[in-house]
Regions:
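Mature catalytic domains of secreted/periplasmic carbohydrate-active enzymes
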Residues: 1-179
Length: 179
């Protein structure tokens, strides 16, 4: 991935990506278990353009704040369970949700069979509330998990939530309550 439109430095290329765009792409790549190759092209004199320094500084600060969800983590849960990138801790007992563009309100996770012990906003430690809706006691189909995100806890780029689970992540992938 380039930070503008060219690999290497080109004086006329001023179409810089924003830190948000790079961080969002990075979160998507990490959620699939991948690594992001990010091109940094120094000028002829060896200096790094200020636009690239900003991207690197912001990406580095965001990584440090959310390192628990990035370094040593595994690719996340299958698409459709949460609408955004996810990762899983190495022992699979924490699920990390990367919440993009959400200022406050409610997000939803589908098909999570686990009991959630605690939900924390990475980087600031805020504990969040959740509720499970639609779970029927006699059915293996889990309910929908709704997580309330209050105003003021969001990261300026992408907020990361840690769901601490009772056991390794278990997702319901069936077709209904009778299979």
């Amino acid at each position: 991935m380039t930070t503008n439109n060219n690999w290497g430095y080109r004086k006329t290329d001023t179409a810089w990506k924003t830190p948000y765009e790079i961080i969002a792409l990075f979160a998507d790549v990490v959620s699939t278990g991948g690594n992001l190759l990010l091109d940094i092209g120094p000028r002829e004199d060896g200096t790094i353009p200020k636009e690239q320094r900003l991207i690197l500084t912001e990406l580095g600060a965001w990584n440090k704040k959310h390192e628990k969800a990035i370094f040593g983590s595994l690719g996340g849960i299958a698409p459709g369970h949460f609408y955004g990138p996810t990762t899983i801790s190495k022992d699979s007992t924490s699920l990390f949700l990367f919440v993009q563009g959400q200022t406050s309100g409610t997000i939803m996770v589908k098909g999570l069979s686990n009991h959630i012990k605690e939900i924390t906003v990475l980087g600031n430690g805020t504990k969040l509330k959740h509720k499970v809706v639609g779970k029927i006691s006699w059915s293996p189909v889990p309910g929908l998990v709704y997580i309330d995100i209050p105003k003021g806890v969001q990261d300026k780029y992408i907020t990361v939530l840690e769901l601490k689970l009772d056991k390794p992540v278990t997702l319901y992938r069936g077709k209904g309550g009778f299979d």
